[in-house]
Amino acid sequence: MEDGPVFYGFKNIFITMFATFFFFKLLIKVFLALLTHFYIVKGNRKEAARIAEEIYGGISDCWADRSPLHEAAAQGRLLALKTLIAQGVNVNLVTINRVSSLHEACLGGHVACAKALLENGAHVNGVTVHGATPLFNACCSGSAACVNVLLEFGAKAQFEVHLASPIHEAVKRGHRECMEILLANNVNIDHEVPQLGTPLYVACTYQRVDCVKKLLELGASVDHGQWLDTPLHAAARQSNVEVIHLLTDYGANLKRRNAQGKSALDLAAPKSSVEQALLLCEGPPALSQLCRLCVRKCLGRACHQAIHKLHLPEPLERFLLYQ
C-alpha cells in the first residue's frame, strides 16, 4: 500500500506545497527589502525604519543601504552633513553591519564632520558587527585630530579583548602619533590581544621602526609578545636589522624559545643580515649596557620620567635614555 500510486501522489502534493510556501516567503522578503530601498532613496526614513524593523526583527534603525548622512560623512561634506542634521536626520542611523556616520567620518579622517556628529549626540563608542569603534577607524586612517576629538567626547581608549584594538591598529599602520595619544590616555602599553600579541609585537611584525623605538622608550616589555613568541621572534622573521638592534639594545633575551622550541636565531633566514646581527649579539654585553638595563629595570616603566629627576650629568642621562 505504501508503494502504491496514492502514496506517491500525496508525497508529491506535500513537496509541492512546501516548495511553494518557501518561495512565497522568500519573495516577501525580497519585496520588503526592495520597498525599504525605495523609501530610503525617496528620503522617507520613518517608513524605511518601520519596514527595516519587520525585516530585521526589531532593529528599527538598521538597514542594508547607507543613508545620505553616511555618504556626507564618508566624503567629508560638512555643509551637506549639517543640513541633514538640521532637517532632523538621526545621527545614530546605522547600516545592517551597525556602521554609523561617525564611523564613516573617522575612517575618512574628516574631523570637522566627526565633531559635528558628536555635538549632535552621535554615539562615541558605537560598535560595528566586526567589533570596530569610531576610535578604531580613526586609528586606521591615522587621523590624530579625530582621535583627540573622540577622546574629548568620552571615547574609551581600550575596550574588552573581543573588540578591535585601536592601539594595535595604529601601530600596525605605523601611525605613531595616534599611538602616543592613546598611551597618554592610559592604554596598557603591554595589552596583549589574541592572534595579534602586544603593540610591540605588532610593530615588529610589520617593521614599524618608529613605533618600535617609541614603545621601547616608553617602557614596553621587550620580551612580551604573543604568548611564547617574543617581539624578537617576530623581528627575526622579517628583514629589518634596525628592529633587531633596537630590541637587543633594550635587553631582549636571545635565548627565549617559542611554542615550537625555536629561538629568534632559528627563525632568521640563513646567511641573512638579520642572522648576522643576531649572531653578533650572542656574545656577552658590555658592562655599560648591563648597568643601563639594571638602572632602567629598577626605575620601572616610568624610567623615562624618573631618569630626569636623578639630576645626573647630561652625558650619563642621555646614555640611560638611549639618546
Curated annotation (Swiss-Prot):
GO terms for biological process: endoplasmic reticulum unfolded protein response; positive regulation of protein catabolic process; proteasome-mediated ubiquitin-dependent protein catabolic process; protein K11-linked ubiquitination; protein ubiquitination. GO terms for cellular component: Cul5-RING ubiquitin ligase complex; endoplasmic reticulum. The gene is ASB11. It comes from Pongo abelii. Keywords: ANK repeat, Endoplasmic reticulum, Repeat, Ubl conjugation pathway. InterPro entries: Ankyrin-SOCS_box_domain (IPR051573), Ankyrin_rpt (IPR002110), Ankyrin_rpt-contain_sf (IPR036770), ASB9/11_SOCS (IPR037333), SOCS_box (IPR001496), SOCS_box-like_dom_sf (IPR036036). ANK repeats lie at residues 64-93, 97-126, 130-159, 162-191, 195-224, 227-256. Substrate-recognition component of the ECS(ASB11) complex, composed of ASB11, CUL5, ELOB, ELOC and RNF7/RBX2. The keyword Repeat applies. This is Ankyrin repeat and SOCS box protein 11.
